[in-house]
Amino acid sequence: WGKAKIAVVLQRDHNVTISESTVGRIVSFLSGKGLISRARSRPQKRRRDFSKGHAQPWKYKDYNDMELGERVQIDHMTATKNGVTVKHFQAWERKSKHIHAQIYSHAKSTSAKKFLKELLQVAPYQIRSIQVDGGSEFMAEFEAECERLQLTLEVLPPSKPTYNGGVERANRTFREDFYDEPEIQADSIGALRFDLKNAVAKYNTYRPHFALNGKTPMEYIRINQA
């Protein structure tokens, strides 16, 4: 987490007041000792062909004109924990910052399809449209499932990962706070899924977000869907 969020949690949960600058110095010290690492950049995805199929190219739309559940960003990353390499799929909702994540043994379109179906079952908001990059995992069966569900599927232009910045930042958060966390001892996909479910719940119901005025994603959704 950033130094500002750490300071808020310390004050909120432990009644300990530490300045952001002090938190920053502690974080810098840990970084200098090699105890904090950054997420590695991923290789560029291949171009998407829009001549056939359900997907359509991404077009600019003002954030203020979007509704809850519109252009939900989905992405995947490769991660290794305790010798187990997994494909981590994640969805990020722009308005509430709500995320859902799941892991699979491969990053094929079948996995992306399974993830989409699971997301639709657990999301506490109506999913109106999906936004992805041009990766092959978001073609074939994934695209067909979006069409079957009548979900708009928008694909980013090549070399524009910043347009999926929300889910990219969420990926980095889970790489640092989950996969790089030494206290998590899970060493199988099943055990990692169990721990990941708990980590996702904590992110959505406990972690404060300054973009939400200190509220959690679930608090934001409850207020705005009331």
Spans of model-derived segments:
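An active-site-proximal beta-strand-loop segment
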Residues: L68-H100, S111
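C-terminal domain-tail junction helix/linker
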Residues: Q56, K61, A140, L149, ...
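Basic, flexible linker segments flanking DNA-binding modules
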Residues: W1-G69, K160, I221-N224
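Mobile genetic element proteins and their domesticated derivatives, centered on retroelements
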Residues: I6, V23, D75, A91, ...
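Residue-level detection of the helix-turn-helix DNA-binding "recognition helix"
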Residues: Q11, S28, G32, E147, ...
